[in-house]
Amino acid sequence: MKNKFSIKVKFPEGILGFEDIKEFIIKDSAHKPFSIMQSINGEINFLVTSPFNFLEKYLPNIENKDWLDIQAENENEKVILCIINMHVKNYKEITANLKAPIILNKKKLIGKQAISTNEEHYLRYRVFKE
């Protein structure tokens, strides 16, 4: 099955823990609403999704400097994704990193991992509530 959606995004600063990787491809996954964020060399893969898929009222406090770093000048250019942590034995244990979202300029295809200063956001937010 061929992926329907695929974009190449530049991360001038890399992402936390992978600062040397500057380009990723974000593409559809067979498991909606998740996407795959894969390094250009194919060695590193992250599962990502919009935090709004499971937390409608997600309001990250992202500094204006972070948006300027990716040249996002208006709301129509801004996209927020979060990295998903999978737990193979129990899907109910899937967590999302709300503390360090991936922010994208969808027009210029530039990204950055930002830090939300909202104290209610956790590194491991449980996606599926009981």
Swiss-Prot record:
HAMAP family given in the database record: FliW
Function: Acts as an anti-CsrA protein, binds CsrA and prevents it from repressing translation of its target genes, one of which is flagellin. Binds to flagellin and participates in the assembly of the flagellum.
Assembly and interaction partners: Interacts with translational regulator CsrA and flagellin(s).
The keyword Membrane appears for this protein: no
Taxonomic classification: Bacteria, Pseudomonadati, Spirochaetota, Spirochaetia, Spirochaetales
Cell compartment(s), UniProt: Cytoplasm
Native source species: Borrelia duttonii (strain Ly)
Location, primary (coarse class): cytoplasm
Superkingdom of this protein's organism: Bacteria
Keywords per UniProt: Bacterial flagellum biogenesis, Chaperone, Cytoplasm, Translation regulation
Database matches in InterPro entries: Flagellar_assembly_factor_FliW, Flagellar_assmbl_FliW_dom_sf
Name of the molecule in the record: Flagellar assembly factor FliW
One cellular component term from this protein's GO annotations in UniProt: cytoplasm
Family from the record: Belongs to the FliW family.
GO biological process: bacterial-type flagellum assembly; regulation of translation
Pfam families: FliW
Keyword Aminoacyl-tRNA synthetase: no
